[in-house]
Amino acid sequence: MERSVMKGKWWINRYWKKQKGFWLIAFSKYMKESPMKALVCVKQVVDHNVRIRIKQDHSDVDISDSKLSINPFDEIAVEEAVRLKERGLISEVVVVSIGNTGVGDVLRTALAAGADRAIHILTKNSLTPLIVAKTITAITRNEKPDIILLGKQAIDDDCNQVGQMLAALLDLPQATNVSEITISDNSLTAVREVDGGLETLNLSLPAVLTTDLRLNTPRNISLPNVIKAKKKPVKEIDFDSLGINPSSRLTIIKVDEPARRKAGII
């Protein structure tokens, strides 16, 4: 009787180990094939705590000796992509930025926040929203992401145009001013803020999303993650390799500070 019981337990344990191994392999295969890639666009801007100065010739904003940081709306986009990865819905987070060598600091910040790798498109020129959208379009066609995230606008020019132009150039569904994101199967539900309240959109993937302030609160980056970010890959490319002409059709005539308001009497 004891031998029969022991033999029965042996077969049960053997069967369980086989089943456990099967499900572990299946889950591992699912994690490799199913999760998606997110491409996050970030921009380096004058820190929001710095008072903006105008050049003496009124040709542009004077950023010399100014603290530069990641655009706050783009920081929210990075945070959301990292959170989606932590929930197992995304397998890779790629960040991309356009600018001079100083933009590398912004990319390292995004990598320290949890992004996996970065793409740096080198240029010294100031670009219009359309050129930026065309550039990100070329990157998107190479990377083939499932979700493209970017801030709804940059705080330096407040154009609020790149996301919309990008979606149009790629012919992809879009949601702007997003305050909530839910992913299920091969579709995405986005809640966006409109003048009358909230609007819920169901989008097929891939899709373009621009983030609002209410989507999340970016995490504080720890020192160990800052150190790890230095070892993550940053690929540098130029406009020639993308086949894009960065010359602008727009010319800035003059930049002035807002006119001072006259004191009122209450």
Question: Which ranges hold each PLM region?
Answer:
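Cationic, amphipathic, low-complexity alpha-helical segments enriched
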Residues: 1-2, 6, 12
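Short, Lys/Arg-enriched N-terminal segments with co-localized hydrophobic residues
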Residues: 3, 20-35
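Intrinsically disordered, low-complexity segments enriched in small/polar residues
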Residues: 6-9, 19, 31, 262
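Tryptophan (W) side chains
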Residues: 10-11, 16, 23
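N-terminal glycine-rich FAD/FM-binding segment characteristic of electron-transfer flavoproteins
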Residues: 31-266
